[in-house]
């Protein structure tokens, strides 16, 4: 199985992408930095670092808050517990053994532990209080998506198309469920969502799948995209976005597919709209926010699927998944800027340069601010001064 990156090389303003099987070269041009009259300037409360961060590698490692502690990690295996008030270190541990740890999926905080996946095909459980390794298990495939916790289980989606449930305290495998993986897929996997005794996740073959959490029995699969075109690249239909639940409706989006709303009880589609994306979506309860494959930011009415607004001024700036901060929608880009938009209109309200290494993930919310992590490992707590 070959895996390809879904966006242009980091830091390049103009990138030629060669589709080998088609022998055609398409030029992707990054939009210039929008001119924004910022209504506020976020201020830094403290700053620290977490090793070398994730570098230029594909990674969705995100900080997580639990038990009044902020946990951060780097790709090479460094994990730290920080005081969110001042950034001071409580403990740190290095998970690198004979080879680089290549942490990539996480961090998840549950059952008084931390759970992190790796490109080496491991899931690692750490004690939240000490950083001690509780267990370390191989799962037979890269873990690029964040593990989730439900019903005493840690559920991971691997790059080989296998959803695996592990005992939260021992790491023992409880069940595994495999789905078909095409020869060519995007680099990335869907973080599952668990609710009401079910687990829902996107697959590499263009489907949203549902299973019973306790025993891993497949309930249904709903197409999100159908392979089309003459080349393998044209036929990519990965559903790498994490499903979100709003009331009795499940939402997800696929690459070369659709944004789809599905009734949780019947598994029937409520509406479908033609948006292509491999990035997580967000909701504020009434709207669904999508980053398209061209890095257009779109707001859609959750009930009807009607497009409310579209902001195309960040085209191909390799945006993070959208995050809701206060009354704003925030995305980071590959050149190290945070862009703040009005949720109702999509208009820019602020812009902030942080670090030219860029962002792999968006901000993590705290009770009194938010934390950002850059690709080179900078960790900063920011607050909004309006």
Residue map of PLM features:
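C-terminal motif of bacterial Sec signal peptides marking the signal peptidase cleavage site
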Residues: 18-20
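Short loop/turn segments that connect beta-strands within beta-propeller blades
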Residues: 83-86, 127-130, 167-171, 213-216, ...
């Amino acid at each position: 199985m070959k895996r390809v990156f879904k966006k242009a090389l980091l830091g390049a303003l103009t990138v030629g992408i060669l589709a080998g099987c088609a022998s055609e070269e398409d030029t992707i041009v990054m939009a210039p930095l929008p001119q924004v009259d910022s209504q506020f300037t976020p201020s830094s409360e403290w700053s620290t670092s977490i090793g070398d961060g994730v570098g230029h590698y594909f990674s969705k490692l995100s900080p997580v808050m639990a038990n009044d502690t902020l946990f951060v990690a780097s790709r090479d295996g460094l994990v730290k517990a920080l005081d969110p008030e001042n950034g001071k270190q409580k403990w740190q541990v290095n998970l690198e053994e004979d080879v680089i740890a290549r942490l990539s999926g996480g961090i998840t905080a549950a059952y008084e532990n931390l759970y992190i996946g790796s490109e080496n095909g491991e899931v690692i459980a750490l004690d939240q209080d000490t950083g001690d390794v509780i267990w370390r298990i191989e799962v037979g495939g890269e873990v690029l998506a964040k593990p989730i916790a439900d019903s005493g289980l840690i559920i991971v989606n691997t790059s080989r198309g296998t959803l695996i449930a592990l005992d939260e305290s021992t790491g023992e495998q409880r069940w595994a469920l495999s789905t078909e993986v095409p020869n060519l897929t995007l680099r990335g996997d869907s973080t599952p969502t668990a609710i009401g005794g079910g687990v829902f996740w996107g697959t590499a073959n263009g489907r949203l799948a549902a299973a019973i959490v306790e025993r891993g029995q497949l309930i249904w699969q709903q197409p999100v995209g159908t392979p089309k075109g003459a080349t393998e690249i044209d036929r990519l239909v990965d559903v790498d976005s994490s499903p979100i639940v709003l009331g009795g409706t499940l939402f997800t989006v696929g690459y070369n597919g659709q944004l789809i709303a599905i009734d949780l009880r019947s598994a029937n589609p409520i509406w479908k709209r033609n948006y292509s994306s491999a990035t997580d979506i967000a909701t504020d309860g009434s709207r669904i926010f999508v980053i398209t494959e061209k890095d257009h930011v779109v707001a859609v009415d959750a009930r009807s699927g009607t497009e409310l607004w579209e902001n195309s001024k960040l085209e191909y700036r390799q945006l993070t998944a959208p995050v809701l901060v206060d009354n704003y929608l925030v995305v980071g880009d590959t050149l190290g800027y945070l862009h703040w938009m009005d949720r109702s209109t999509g208009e820019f309200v602020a812009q902030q340069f942080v670090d030219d290494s860029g962002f792999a993930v968006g901000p993590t919310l705290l009770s009194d601010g938010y934390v950002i992590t850059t690709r080179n490992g900078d960790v900063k707590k920011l607050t909004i001064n309006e």
